[in-house]
A protein has these predicted regions:
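Preference for protein termini
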Residues: 1-494
Length: 494
């Protein structure tokens, strides 16, 4: 692959490169180096076999540049008083409180189709950044085309430092030069969360940088003498992984008080969610007439209209029109997250449609995700007459095949009774962003109508592209940023 990589050549790689790029031994070493043992790696393999895909996704520098342009255009509009007053007016009371910090780990999720990248949604508690750092470091070059590729504008070796600096920047923005001594990583029943391994990795990362860190359920927090406490120790900063974005649930009352009374810095926070992640924000961001009232330049408006899936509010007054157009629409709850209660219009029943009309939903233009061809190991049965000696099963129906969850260990086609099935998985690309600057790109491979971690061969995957025009992608980048370039791990064959 050359620096003039075209969309067609990248599509060919995503369609025809069936190589396994993950190096399980390297991933085990990365996680063991972070934690001091390999227990986390073993736990992930045993309990989360579809967390990591065994393959990578390829994109072009042009696609990356377009995603960056959309992100910058959104930041430009969000900075305007017109936008901010409109977004906060429809948000919860908690959102009105401004901590004067941007909030860590915004996730801009894109579908990459034939008409270029289109933004689907923005998340303010985007998970997976640190997991994807270790995953990207554990890749091996499967072919000559992979040489010289990068996974983002920041060098992989520098990303952990970048993330810690981000939290320190949040702290300084709100607290000045006061020392940041203790962080609580907070979620409901954290040990049961699918991304709990990332909590453990962040805890270790903070501690390596001289910051005490604890993983806590909100019920373990208390307020005493004007301080937020966990296990009798003062909490300076809460790394908030909750999906109660307005801190409205009774179980989060202590955090809500700490938020309003500035007893601790909470990030990501309700203010950022109201400005970025409420899906109703995508309505004005794809309305040219409204955008013109913000004072945005024509080039900014055009970038948004081309780069964001058009979004409308679901209202009973327009129910008949929306129902007629439903096959071209995707319906999402305005304050939702992930795949919870989302529906493809062509799958809707009248009963579900009535539930949508009774709730707060947006209707978004259906933008198909990209596709990545992968090989998954299957066990043949008498139904397909298969044998262990067959090299591959053609793409198509899985009749008679039992999928084997081998994504994380790269598969083992030599197992008795196993063959390789070629199948197409969908993918989206997530840009992890802080203060308007992209830190890392990652993909999620899946089957079904929305991303999940239940698909054999699916899960997080690194995104590779030639490092062209890095200087325009981030303030700290340059075309000669050798630290960001993908190279095979030392001692590994290609």
């Amino acid at each position: 692959m050359t620096t003039s990589t075209s969309t067609s050549s990248v599509s060919t790689l995503n369609r025809e490169c069936l190589c396994t790029t993950i190096n399980p031994a390297a991933l085990e070493r990365e996680l063991a180096a972070a934690l001091g043992d390999n227990e986390l790696y073993r736990s992930i393999r045993a309990t989360r076999p579809h967390l990591f895909s065994a393959t990578a996704v390829f994109v072009t520098p042009g696609q990356v540049d377009k995603m960056r342009a959309v992100i910058e255009a959104i930041e430009t509009v969000i900075a305007t008083p017109t936008y901010r007053s409109a977004a906060l007016a429809r948000a919860s009371s908690a959102a009105a409180h401004d901590p004067h910090s941007p909030g860590v780990f915004l996730g801009y999720d894109f579908h990459l189709g034939e008409h270029g990248p289109r933004l689907i949604e923005i998340n303010t508690n985007a998970g997976g950044a640190l997991l994807n750092v270790y995953l990207a470091r554990a890749q091996k070059a499967c072919c000559q085309e992979m040489h010289g590729l990068t996974t983002g504008p920041v060098a992989l070796a520098a990303l952990e430092e970048e993330f810690v600096a981000m939290f320190r920047s949040e702290w300084r923005a709100a607290r000045g030069e006061l020392p940041l001594a203790r962080i609580a990583i907070v979620d409901d029943a954290p040990a049961t969360q699918y991304l709990y391994p990332e909590f453990v990795l962040f805890q270790a990362l903070f501690r390596r940088h001289g910051i005490d860190a604890q993983i806590a359920d909100p019920a373990e927090l208390e307020i005493r003498n004007g301080r937020l406490l966990h296990a009798d120790g003062t909490v300076d900063l809460v790394y908030n992984r909750l999906t109660d974005f307005a801190l409205e649930e009774p179980a989060h009352a202590v955090l809500r008080t700490a938020w309003f009374d500035d007893l601790a810095l909470i990030t990501p926070h309700p203010h950022a969610h109201a400005l970025y992640a409420d899906k109703r924000n995508l309505i004005p961001l794809t309305d040219p007439e409204w955008l013109s009232t913000t004072g945005a330049e024509p080039v900014v408006i055009e970038t948004l209209l081309q780069g964001i899936a058009r979004t409308r509010l679901v209202e009973r007054a327009h129910a008949e029109t929306l129902w007629a157009e439903r096959k071209r629409l995707f319906f999402k709850p305005a304050g939702g997250f992930g795949s919870k209660a989302v529906y493809r219009g062509d799958k809707l029943t009248r009963r579900v449609w009535e539930e949508i009309l009774a709730g707060e939903y947006v209707a978004q233009e259906l933008v198909p995700p990209g596709e990545r061809q992968v090989q998954i190991e299957t066990e043949t049965t008498a139904m397909d007459g298969g044998s262990a000696g067959r090299e591959a099963v053609p793409t198509g129906t899985n009749a008679g095949a039992v999928l084997r969850p081998t994504a994380m260990d790269g598969g083992s086609a030599g197992d008795a009774g196993a063959v390789l099935q070629s199948t197409a998985l969908k993918y989206d690309v997530r840009c992890f962003v802080y203060a308007g600057k992209v830190q890392l790109l990652a993909a999620r491979l899946y089957q079904g109508q929305a991303t999940n971690f239940r698909t054999p061969g699916g899960g997080f995957a690194p995104v590779f592209y030639p490092p062209v025009n890095e200087a325009s992608f981030t303030d700290g980048g340059s075309a000669g940023n050798e630290g960001a370039v993908f190279r095979p791990p030392a001692g590994e064959t290609e």
